[in-house]
Amino acid sequence: MTVVRQDESAGCFRKLDAVRDELDIITCTDAGAWEAWLAANHRLRRGVWLKIAKQRTRVASVTNDEAVDVGLCWGWISGHRKALDDTYFLQRYTPRRPRSNWSAVNVAKVEELIADGRMQPPGLAEIDAAKADGRWERPARL
């Protein structure tokens, strides 16, 4: 039996039995819930599987695009995606590793997030580190 309980952040639910890499699975009902979860946990966790509803299902969920933007604001990046069932997929999110490359797509997204005033101190710190060591000026092309 899978036990799910409300996490410390409103709108996010944490699955207590973790996938094999021992990261929790959380479900956030919207972008605000994902942002609240990261605000509370970005320094405490080494990663998480975010359960995202597939578009055709119309289930209340943070969207993939929203999740990427919010993750970047907090210095986290998306990684591997796994199919889960007919309704959801799992997207792995982790804090950006030191010296990890920035994609041209994420550089452009972050510039928009800065202009919109959405970036948070942890995300800005990742940008500063990338600018300091040259990764910002030579983003990877995907």
Set out the residue ranges of the language-model regions.
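Charge-dense, helix-prone N-terminal extensions
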Residues: 3-4, 8-142
